A protein has these predicted regions:
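Conserved hydrophobic/amphipathic alpha-helical signal-anchor segments
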Residues: 33-75
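Periplasmic/extracellular, small/polar-rich flexible segments of pilin-like filament-forming proteins
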Residues: 59-144
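Context-gated lysine
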Residues: 6, 32, 37-39, 82, ...
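N-terminal single-pass transmembrane signal-anchor helix
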Residues: 2-35, 42, 46, 50
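Hydrophobic transmembrane signal anchors and adjacent membrane-proximal interface regions, especially
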Residues: 23, 39, 48, 108-109, ...
Length: 144
């Protein structure tokens, strides 16, 4: 009577390992990108707080504010610097908000890079904000 072997052949095991390798090669870079985007959310939320303060300042009839340091942003616009912990440098010039992300806080891909919010006054009195960056990879610049 022939005894039948149970288990996987070497080819089957190699195919499974290859499939796992392909999935890992796709998933790991996507995970890294999403992790960076999640950490950047803290920066964009802090900048959005400043944008709200800039919009309120403008709509009170004061014109576009200018504050060239985080301390001035906090004192003149009333924005807490706790929300700006990952931002190394922050300034507002005629309503345009410019932030430089702190070194060694998120990832070398975005650390020390500049993120800019540019306001546009609409005819109905609302303000539309546009995000941009000259040195940050486009995948990390907010779309909204």
């Amino acid at each position: 009577m022939l005894r039948r072997e149970k288990g996987f052949t070497l080819i089957e095991l190699l195919i499974v390992i290859a499939i796992i390798g392909i999935l890992a090669a796709i998933a790991i870079p996507m995970y890294k990108t999403q992790t960076i985007k999640a950490k950047l959310t803290e920066v964009t939320n802090g900048m959005s707080n400043v944008a709200s303060a800039v919009a309120a300042y403008m709509q009170e009839g004061n014109g576009w504010p200018t504050a060239n340091s985080q301390d001035l942003v906090q004192s003149s616009l009333g924005v807490s610097t706790k929300a700006l912990s990952r931002i190394g440098s922050l300034g507002v010039n005629n309503g345009v908000i410019t932030a430089i992300i702190s070194a060694n806080t998120i990832d070398p891909t975005v650390d020390n890079k500049t993120l800019v919010m540019v306001p546009t006054s609409n005819t109905d009195g609302s303000i539309t904000w546009t995000w941009s960056s000259s040195d940050m990879p486009p995948a990390y610049v907010p779309k909204r």
